[in-house]
Regions:
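N-terminal amphipathic alpha-helix/helix-capping segment at the start of soluble metabolic enzymes
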Residues: 1-22, 132-133, 255-257
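Active-site-adjacent beta->alpha loops and helix N-cap segments on the catalytic face
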Residues: 2-6, 54-71, 84-90, 104-126, ...
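Structural preference for beta-strand elements that scaffold enzyme active sites
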Residues: 5-9, 46, 74-78, 99-101, ...
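Conserved, mostly hydrophobic/aromatic
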Residues: 11, 39, 47, 92, ...
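Conserved anion-binding
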Residues: 12-14, 18-19, 97-174, 178-179, ...
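N-terminal beta-alpha supersecondary unit
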Residues: 17-60
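Short, acidic/polar
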Residues: 28-40, 85-91, 153-163, 211-214
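Catalytic cores of alpha/beta
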Residues: 73, 77-100, 189-226
Length: 257
């Protein structure tokens, strides 16, 4: 049985790690390199870096820190932000990232997914899906890194997830925007609905506030990993303790000695 992944998420803006609530009111958390090293040493299974200003501002993320991250940590990491072409992705992967993630650019031009998969392989290509419950239904949102530039699309998350899979993406990160940063737990029902409609790995994002939330998302959905930010940045949850509790609850996890 594959182990479930614990994935700290580092939102990057203007060269530092930040965190907001429901994608708004971001506060500075700290240095990218130091936090990456901290989470790697603590036993995280993977890291995700989002340059949250890149897509809304129509620019590629700064890549100067990626090579340094690759030198410092020994776990896989994924990088996202403003990737609009094979050339953009190649620059990031060449610096040492293991995966790249696309979101808004894939919504604008879905063929981008096919092109990235053809060039780099399924295992390198992640698609982020920002899902928001609006007027009684879930819709996929775009350009969510900036409050005044966020766009609600006409797509429902299940249909978009199916298309993403059909185009060859290797993984989906489903971020439930209504739950983001509020620490009330993952949206189990929505995660389950999307996960049951695709066969590729789905990563849960948005809502972690305590260890029980991680236990619940792994027990009551078949997602492959859980992404979180605030609980790790604010030292609410220590990754070694989280891993031990998952193990006690018969959830397969990698324990760091």
């Amino acid at each position: 049985m594959l182990t479930k992944r614990i994935i700290p998420c580092l939102d990057v803006k203007d060269g530092v790690v930040v965190k907001g609530v429901k994608f708004r009111n971001h506060r500075i958390i700290g240095d990218i390199i130091e936090l990456a090293q901290k989470y790697s040493d603590a036993g995280a299974d993977e890291l995700v870096f989002y340059d949250i200003g890149a897509s809304p501002d129509n620019k590629l993320l700064s890549i100067k820190w990626i090579q340094e991250i690759a030198k410092k940590i020994n776990i896989p990491f994924c990088v996202a932000g403003g990737i609009k072409s094979v050339e953009n992705a190649r620059a990031i992967l060449n610096e040492g990232a293991d995966k790249i993630s696309v979101n808004s650019a894939a919504l604008a031009r879905p063929d981008l997914i096919d092109e990235l998969v053809y060039e780099f392989g399924t295992q390198c290509v992640v698609v982020g899906v920002d899902s928001k419950f609006i007027d009684g239904e879930f819709k996929v949102c775009q350009y969510t890194g900036s409050a005044d530039k966020t766009v609600q699309t006409l797509l429902d998350p299940v249909s978009w997830a199916k298309e993403v899979e059909s185009r060859g993406a290797g993984e989906i990160v489903l971020n439930c925007m209504n739950h983001d940063g509020v620490k009330g737990g993952y949206d189990l029902e929505h995660l389950r609905e999307v996960q049951l409609n695709v066969s590729i790995p789905v990563i849960a994002s948005g809502g972690a506030g305590e260890i029980q939330h991680f236990i619940d998302v792994f027990k009551y959905t078949n997602i492959d990993g859980a992404l979180a930010a605030s609980v790790f940045h604010d030292d609410i949850i220590a990754i070694p303790e989280l891993k031990q509790e998952l193990f006690k609850n018969n959830i397969p996890t990698r324990i760091v000695k």
